[in-house]
Structure formats: C-alpha cells, structure tokens
C-alpha cells in the first residue's frame, strides 16, 4: 500500500476506525483509441496516488467553522490498483483502494470531494465504501470526467446514491446540493472550455456561415414567432464577423471538439464505433465514385443492377501504396473493426433488409402502403375524415389548396362501397404531405430538386392490409401562390407506360415522405425537442433528486449527437442539405412545423387518437382501440408505452403521495418552469402545457419524455438503413417532373422505364452520400444501454424503485416474446409484407451493429 493514510482527524478521539473503499477509474484518451502520454494506467498510477485526494462529507456531523455544512474527513489518497476490469488499453477501467479514518460521530457519509492534482483528466466511475460501521456499504455513482483542480472554480463533489426530495435533504448536505446546481448553471457568459460542466441555452444561430458569402447564410431558428424552435446547448463561441447575431463555427476538421458539457460527450467505445462506422462509410462512398469516373454516364445509375452492385461483389481489399498509407494512419482498434469477418466488408454496403429476400417486392403497391404502418416513418398516416381532403393553409395567402381527388378516381376500388360508406366504416386513410411542403415548394423547385406536394389515399382491406387508391401531385400555381395549385391525380396501373407513371408517382410520394421523416419525424420530434429537457434537468434537478435519477439515462449522448449534427449534418451545405429534397430550406421548414408541436400529443395514445387511427376506449388494454388492427408500430408501441407508464407510475408514486408534495418541491417546479419558459420558450404561452401541480401530471410528463427519447426515436431511426439503404425504395430527391406525353422524357419512359426512374430520383453521388449517412445512423454502438437497463445496478439505494425497475425489465422481456409471436403469425400480413421484413424496430434489446431492432434509452445517434 503506497497511498497516504491520514490520522488524527477527530481531534484526539480514540474510537477512530478505518473505512476501506474501492475507486473505479478510467484513463484519459484523446480520440478514444490511443493517448499513451496521458494514460493513467500501470506505473503512472504509482505517481498519481499522491495526486488524487478524497474527502468524505458527513451527513450528520456539522463543521462549526463551515456553517451548516457537513464535516470533511482528512484527505485520503489512491492506493495500489486492485485489478483491471477491462484490457489495459486506452479506455480501460481499473479499481484502486482508498482508506479513510472514521468515527461514530462522523456517521454516514453523504458526499465526497475529489481533488485532481495530476496534469491530466480521468474518468471517475464510482467510489464504494465497503463497510461503514452501523451503515454497511455506501455507494457513490460518479460517471464523470475529473479535470485538474486548477480548471475548476469550485470543488468537485459527488453524492451517495440515496435520493432525496429537496425538503428531505439532510440539512448538512443542503448547501452542497444548492451550490452544485449553481455550478452547473453557470452565469450565461463566456466561451465554454473542454473542462466546463455548464448547461445553458441558446438559439439555433450557428447553422450558417455568413462570413463565407450569402449562399451560406441560414435563418436563425428560435426566439421569434416566425421561426420558433427548441433551444440548444450554449457554446459561447464569438459571433461571425459579418453578422453579430450569428455564432461563428469551428473548422470542419475540429468537429469532434464542438462544446458540450464534458460528461455529455461520447464514451470511448461509442466514439470508437462512431468514427469507425464513419470511416467505413467514407471508403464505401469514395470507391463507387472512382468507378463512375470511367463510366459513360458519371453520377447516374444506368440500371437497377448498377444500384445492386453497391451491396454485392466488392469485397476484395485493394492493394498498393495508397491502401497501405491509409491503414498505417488508422489506429489499431479501428483497423480491427474495419477488417472484421462478420460478413460486413469495408468495401461494400450491407444488403438492406428491404431487398434481402426479394430484389423487386419493394415496388409492389402492398409494400408501398405497408411501410406507412411498419416502415421507418409510421407516424404520419391518418384516417380520412372529410372528402375530398381539405387544406388548412390560409386561403388568403395560398388560394384554394383543397384536393382535386374525386369519387370517380377511387370508387371502383372500394370493394363495392361508396366513398361515404368507406369513410363511415373507417376504411379510408391518407398520407398527407401537402400542407407542409406547398409553402416552400416554389423555392425548393428553383434548386436541383423538381418535385411535388403529395396526398395519397388508401383503402383498408378486409385482410388488414392497405391498398393505394390515388396519388395527387400538386405544384404552386404558375401565376402566384394566391391562385392555389395545379394538381394531377394518378391511379394504380400495371399495364404499359401507365404502370411506369404509377411507379414514378409513388416515388414522388416517397421523396416527400423521406424528407418529412428526416427533418420532422426524426430530427425535430426527437433530437431537437428533447435537448431542452436534457439541459433543464441538469440545471434545475440535483443528482440527488428522484426525477433526475429517473430521467438521466434517457439523455445519454443526446447533446453530443445534436452538437455534431449542427456541425456537419443540418448546417448550411451539410450532409442533410445535400441529400434531402428540401435542400437549404430544410431546417427553416422544420421551424414552421414546430409551430404545431404540442407536448401532450407526443404521448403515443394521444398521437394515435389525434391522427384518427385509434379511438379512446376504456375497455381496451391501453385505453385506445386501433382502427387498423394490424398496425405494427402502434401495436408494439402501445405495449412499450404501457410498460414505461407503469414503471414511471410506480417510481413517482414512491416519492410523491399528494398534490402538496409536488407543489412544495422547489426544484421540480423550477425545472418545469424553465422547460416551458426557456427550453421551449417560443411556446411558453401555449395552454396545453401541464401545470405540474399533481403526481399524475408528473407521471404523464415523464412517461412522454421517456417515450420520445427511447421508443419514438428507435422507431424512426433504426429502420433507416433497412428501408432507405436501398435508395430506389425511399429516394431523397427527385430531379425532374413527371414526363408528359409527347416529350422525349415520356418516350424514354416507354422505352426504358427503369433508366427513366433512376434518372428521376436521387443521383448516384447523392445516393452514396445518403446511404452512407443512414448506415451510420442505423447502427447500434457496442456500449449502447437499452430500455430497461441501467449503466450501474447501484443507481439508487431505494429498494422499492429497484424492485419496480426489475418488474419493468421483465415486462419488456415479455413484450419481446409477444413481438416474436406476432411476427410469426401469417394472418398479420403487415408484420413482414411482400419484402419479408419482420417488424422489430420496437424490439427492446439488441446487440451492436446494424440490427434493425433495439430501443436505446436515449437519442444517442
């Protein structure tokens, strides 16, 4: 034992004893692969032992010289390492001994202070006191980076895992609790540094770069009635030179260094996987482009066989000096991942699920409709409740935007029913992208995009599947918006050129749906709206607060992935602008859609009822009855929703038994006030916000937060590669309008419909970029933590919540079995469809990689 053990702590008391503890730490790393100079492994810890001190804080014995605060023990220091928990490489965990003096008066420690006098930071995972007399084991869950003490303005403090409501906090810990929250809030000034732990808000004024010219200017989102938006994390970077209201951007090469509070950054395994997947995608992206240089039609796929070559046949590794130089520059861990032998080669994209069983089934009408219920964007379809469909756009600004679909277009496909009869029998549904797209369509079509706003009507057949009836494609009126639109209606056909036109009509719908999915269903409704909850929770709820402990796992990595997205995905000229049809108007469009965002409607039952695909029914298991019984997303989702709500109800009910306890919780009230007035401040005056006056309002709100962060995000994210990895199925852009009779394009459509289709949808370069992106986003990292799991089994000391969490996990296991059973039921045709792709996006658990299943706790990718 080489650590220094101090004595004489208690001023001459002879009843002092030794309390032994175990500290688990992880060494520093830079790119989360190698940083031997900063490593805190092996012999370096022999020196470090004297440079990391721990002081316990009593929760029962006060310090008369320190006001109403708990007494500190004398410093104790790290001793020799006990064991290494993982292989001794960058990112490994090592356990160390530490010994404290203790006596009866000191009682149970409620917190400890750590001081790092070393030159490098390290990751502190936990401290466990093995046997505090009369109290047993005391566990401190830390999971935090500790920088050298000179970087901090106040002590680093960690609390034991016993939760307390503010009013129940031991008096001697109260000041520490309050001061820690003040530290995390900061003062709203200055540029944030890597070691900062400050959570603060800002508007989206960092998407553009006006210093690089007008084409790189982007609208500021948030802080205005015209473009409202959820708040993001503040970085404090200086303004641009040309626009003092725009925040400057960091160089692309430094993208990984964009500020988020240090403990919000990806862990070492997550960063390793993330960078590896990105490198694989870059290689997969570049090689076909090199081949295209020698192609007669560069940047075009000439046939579907050309597209399929992305996934087949290019496994042979290249040789020569270029490849050797590339591999020499890549860290060892990445090379192992890149060259692994699990069937995914570096030089080809994995075969997407939608074409794994059949190369052509994706083109069927049944699959086109099924993906509205079980694909990557199953949250848009709604029941048709008026015919013809009417627009909600202001007629003074946009003229007549109502649908031109008539009964004559569809009544021959309604199994003998009239339109009114079909509507009254809940048989008619609509995929409606018209009102979202029309206000921007004139501007969008001035770019390379040439597309329409679409409405698709569908009929619910007796076998439970949906049948497309008609597609309406609309353009802004050439004489001006006030004159409405020009529209054309297309109906199904399987004969001649009309069949090819119908396939193109479905492609235009898919372009609409893909853009709406990526910007609204995915980015806005999960990533963007959840970030204010992350910030407010850390600013207003102490780590001691039970609700902080409830929600904390559902915020893991969200600020990091969102910051990365602002840097390289949703920024001006970023990957998203380069791949979706909305182009440079994408984020601005999402701000307009946010005007209609309603927090209580994000609850799954409320969403289903609002879209008319379910009705309230107290006799149904989840309080609603589905009008499409075989609706995989809704069926599985309601099971998950119910499990989450039961867990949250059990948990919250343990701490709050009355309205009064909710109202007197000053941290809880400050949290909810800040969420409404700052985090989602552009909607602070909306009447629908829960008032947070009752336990039920807390339960409902926390259930919705967890649902958004976990299951909703899983449903709209991890199916991206399985369905959109094959771009003809979900094209992101259309480059020319529907061919008109008598034109060369129409003749080409008759002569070579496949080539005409491919020349209409996403070009080769955009396809490769888009497929590379969705492959990265669809992968689970190897350190993912799924719904029903926790990073530490010691996350709380309270036994009843631990038992409730165990029940939650068992319920999720039961749901997995039910999903497997439903997917094996041949009567439920929408579960797998013509492409034979079983619906598993709400299957709770998964292994790492491209699995098409698994619900991570948080918006983590």
Swiss-Prot record:
Coiled-coil intervals: none
Note on cofactor: Binds 1 Fe cation per subunit. Iron is tightly bound.
Domain of life: Eukaryota
Limits of the Lipoxygenase domain: 163-861
Catalytic reactions of this protein: (9Z,12Z)-octadecadienoate + O2 = (9S)-hydroperoxy-(10E,12Z)-octadecadienoate
Pathway(s) this gene product operates in, as recorded in its UniProt entry: Lipid metabolism; oxylipin biosynthesis
Keyword annotations: Cytoplasm, Dioxygenase, Fatty acid biosynthesis, Fatty acid metabolism, Iron, Lipid biosynthesis, Lipid metabolism, Metal-binding, Oxidoreductase, Oxylipin biosynthesis
Entry cofactors: Fe cation
Organ and tissue specificity: Expressed in tubers. Detected in sprouts and flowers. but not in leaves or stems.
UniProt-annotated location(s): Cytoplasm
Binding-site list for Fe cation: 522, 527, 713, 717, 861
Function recorded in the entry: Plant lipoxygenases may be involved in a number of diverse aspects of plant physiology including growth and development, pest resistance, and senescence or responses to wounding. Catalyzes the hydroperoxidation of lipids containing a cis,cis-1,4-pentadiene structure.
Protein name in the entry: Probable linoleate 9S-lipoxygenase 7
């Amino acid at each position: 034992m080489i650590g220094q053990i101090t004595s004489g702590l208690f001023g001459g008391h002879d009843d002092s004893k030794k309390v032994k503890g175990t500290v688990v730490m992880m060494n520093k790393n830079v790119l989360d692969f190698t940083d031997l100079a900063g490593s805190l492994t092996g012999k370096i810890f022999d020196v470090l032992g004297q440079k990391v001190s721990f002081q316990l804080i009593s929760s029962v014995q006060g310090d008369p010289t320190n006001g109403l605060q708990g007494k500190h023990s004398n410093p104790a220091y790290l001793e020799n390492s006990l064991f290494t928990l993982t292989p001794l490489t960058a990112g490994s965990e090592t356990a160390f001994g530490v010994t404290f003096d203790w006596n009866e008066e000191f009682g149970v420690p409620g917190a400890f202070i750590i001081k790092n006098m070393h030159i490098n930071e390290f990751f502190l995972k936990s401290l466990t006191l093995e046997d505090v007399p009369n109290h047993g084991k005391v566990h401190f869950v830390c999971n935090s980076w500790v920088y050298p003490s000179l970087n901090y303005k106040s002590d680093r403090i960690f609390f034991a895992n016993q939760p307390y409501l503010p009013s129940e906090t031991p008096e001697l810990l109260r000041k520490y609790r309050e001061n820690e929250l003040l530290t995390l809030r900061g003062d709203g000034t200055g540029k944030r540094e890597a070691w900062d732990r400050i959570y603060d808000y800002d508007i989206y004024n960092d998407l553009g770069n006006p210093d690089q010219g007008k084409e790189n200017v982007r609208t500021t989102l948030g802080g205005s009635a015209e473009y409202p938006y959820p708040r993001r994390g503040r970085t404090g970077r200086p303004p641009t030179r040309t626009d003092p209201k725009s925040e400057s951007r960091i160089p692309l090469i430094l993208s990984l260094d964009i500020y988020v509070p240090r403990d919000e950054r990806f862990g070492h395994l997550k960063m390793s996987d993330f960078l590896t997947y990105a490198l694989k995608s870059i290689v997969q992206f570049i090689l076909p482009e090199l081949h295209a240089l020698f192609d007669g039609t560069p940047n075009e796929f000439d046939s579907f066989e050309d597209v399929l070559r992305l996934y087949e046949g290019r496994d042979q590794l290249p040789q020569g000096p270029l490849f050797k130089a590339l591999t020499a520059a890549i860290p060892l861990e990445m090379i192992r991942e890149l060259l692994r032998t699990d069937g995914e080669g570096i030089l080809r994209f994995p075969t997407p699920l939608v074409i794994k069983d059949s190369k052509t089934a994706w083109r069927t009408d049944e699959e086109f409709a099924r993906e509205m219920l079980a694909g990557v964007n199953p949250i848009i379809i709604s029941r048709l409740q008026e015919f013809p469909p009417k627009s909600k756009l202001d007629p003074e600004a946009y003229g007549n935007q109502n649908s031109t679909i008539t009964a004559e277009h569809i009544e021959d496909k309604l199994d003998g029913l009239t339109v009114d009869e079909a509507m009254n029998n809940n048989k008619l549904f609509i995929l409606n992208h018209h009102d979202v797209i029309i206000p921007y369509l004139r501007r969008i079509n001035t770019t390379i995009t040439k597309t329409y706003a679409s409405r698709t009507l569908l009929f619910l057949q007796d076998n439970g599947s949906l049948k497309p009836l008609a597609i309406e494609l609309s353009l802004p009126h050439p004489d001006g918006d006030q004159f409405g639109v020009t529209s054309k209606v297309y109906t199904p056909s399987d004969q001649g050129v009309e069949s090819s036109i119908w396939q193109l009509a479905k492609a235009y719908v898919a372009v609409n749906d893909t853009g709406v999915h990526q910007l609204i269903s995915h980015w806005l409704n999960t990533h963007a709206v959840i970030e204010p909850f992350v910030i407010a929770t850390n600013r207003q709820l102490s780590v001691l607060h039970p609700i902080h402990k409830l929600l904390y796992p559902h915020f893991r990595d969200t600020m990091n992935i969102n910051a990365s997205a602002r840097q390289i995905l949703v920024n001006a000229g970023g990957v998203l602008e380069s791949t979706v049809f909305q182009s440079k108007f994408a984020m601005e469009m999402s701000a307009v859609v946010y005007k209609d965002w309603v927090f209580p409607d994000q609850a799954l039952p409320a969403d289903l009822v609002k879209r008319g695909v379910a009705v309230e029914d107290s006799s149904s298991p989840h309080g609603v009855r589905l009008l499409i019984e075989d609706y995989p997303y809704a069926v599985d989702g309601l099971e998950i929703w119910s499990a989450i709500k039961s867990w949250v109800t059990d948990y919250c009910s343990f701490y709050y038994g009355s309205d009064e306890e909710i109202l007197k919780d000053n941290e809880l009230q400050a949290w909810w006030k800040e969420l409404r007035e700052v985090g989602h401040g552009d909607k602070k005056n909306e009447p629908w916000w829960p008032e947070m006056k009752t336990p039920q309002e807390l339960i409902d709100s926390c259930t919705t937060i967890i649902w958004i962060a976990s299951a909703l995000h899983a449903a709209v994210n991890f199916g991206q590669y399985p369905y959109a990895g094959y771009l003809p199925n979900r094209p992101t852009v259309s480059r020319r309008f529907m061919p008109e009779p008598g034109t060369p394009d129409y003749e080409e459509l008759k002569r070579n419909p496949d080539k005409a289709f491919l020349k209409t949808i996403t070009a080769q370069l955009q396809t490769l970029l888009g497929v590379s992106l969705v492959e990265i986003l669809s992968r689970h990292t190897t350190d993912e933590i799924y719904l029903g799991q926790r990073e530490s089994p010691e996350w709380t000391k309270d036994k009843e919540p631990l038992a409730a969490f165990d029940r939650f996990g068992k319920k999720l296991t039961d749901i997995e079995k039910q999903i497997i059973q439903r997917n094996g039921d041949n009567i439920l045709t929408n579960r797998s469809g013509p492409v034979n792709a079983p619906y598993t996006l709400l299957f709770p658990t998964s292994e790492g990689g491209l699995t098409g299943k698994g619900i991570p706790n948080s918006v983590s990718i």
